[in-house]
Structures are given as C-alpha cells and as structure tokens.
A protein has these predicted regions:
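Conserved ABC ATPase signature
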Residues: 51-56, 60
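Catalytic Walker B motif of ABC-type/P-loop ATPase nucleotide-binding domains
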Residues: 77-80
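C-terminal boundary and immediately downstream tail of ABC-type ATPase nucleotide-binding domains
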Residues: 139-157
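Conserved ABC ATPase "signature" region
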Residues: 26-46
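Helical segment within the ABC ATPase nucleotide-binding domain
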Residues: 91-103
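Conserved catalytic motifs of ABC-family nucleotide-binding domains
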Residues: 73
C-alpha cells in the first residue's frame, strides 16, 4: 500500500523538500506543482491541495508517493508492486505515468504481473525462488524465454 503522510496533499511534498534543504515558499510551490503534474495527479487534485492526503484513493496515493519521490530528483526509483490492490483505472493511470517518465528516470519495478512488465519494462530480470534466472530485454524475454520457470509463467499470460 502506498503511504500518504497524515498531512495535507501539499505538505506531503513540501515536507520532503524542506527535509532536503529547500525552504523558499515559491520554489516549494513550483516543485510541488511540477512533481504532481509529472505524476499525472495535479489536474485531479489542484483544488484540494490543503485537504488530507489520507482521503485520496489508492491510485491517487500511489501517484502522490511517486510525486513525493520525484521531488528530490532520484537517480533510481524503486517501486515494489506499484499497482497491487488497485483497480484497472488506477493501474492504467500508474502505468501511463511510468511510461511518460520512462526516459527521464530509471525505474526498478518489482512485480508478479508479467503482463504489466511486458507493457512498461525495457529490461527484465526474472527470478524464481530468490534466484536470478534471466536478465534480458523485454522482447527477448517474452518471445524466447531461456528458463523453464519463465516459459511456464509466460504460457499463462
């Protein structure tokens, strides 16, 4: 489950910025807006920035968590099952957000959803029982899996 701090939507991001040394109000407002836009959340909540982030839907909380992470310009963003427990509408919103950000950020996404990996990943690291079995580009993985466990999983897609 994505974590939304008990603060307002706006403060969920400004808290991180202040922690990282950004104090000027105009700069905080600008970065907050930009990151919410990058996470494709701003248009949905722009009139509710002072409201509690706890009232957001699961998908909105996930996009808020992504926006919060983007505030500090990470080299790598680690997402663990970013769409688990989300409905299809919010899953699509998260995937579209990640695809839009793909060229600007490096993502490491842990997922059991191979169809999702096929839609959004450039590279696949396939693991089974804690062991890495394959490391390859997405097209090769799905067209010519080299391990039996991968072939078994792909056949059920």
């Amino acid at each position: 489950q994505p974590i939304a701090f008990q603060y307002s939507i706006e403060k969920n991001l400004s808290y991180v910025l202040k922690y990282h040394g950004i104090r000027e109000a105009g700069e905080i407002e600008r970065i907050t807006r930009e990151c919410l836009q990058k996470a494709r959340l701003y248009d949905e909540i722009k009139d509710q920035l002072k409201k509690s982030a706890k009232k957001l839907s699961g998908g909105q909380k996930q996009r808020l968590a992504i926006a919060r992470s983007l505030c500090v310009n990470p080299e790598i963003l680690l997402l663990d099952e970013p769409c688990s427990a989300l409905d299809m509408k919010n899953t699509i919103a998260i995937e579209e957000t990640l695809l839009e950000l793909k060229g600007k950020y490096t993502f490491v996404i842990v997922t059991h959803n191979l169809a999702q990996a096929k839609r959004i990943a450039d590279q696949i690291i396939f693991m089974d029982q804690g062991r890495v079995l394959e490391v390859t580009d997405t097209k090769t993985f799905f067209e010519h899996p080299s391990s039996e466990p991968a072939r078994e999983q792909i056949q059920y897609m």
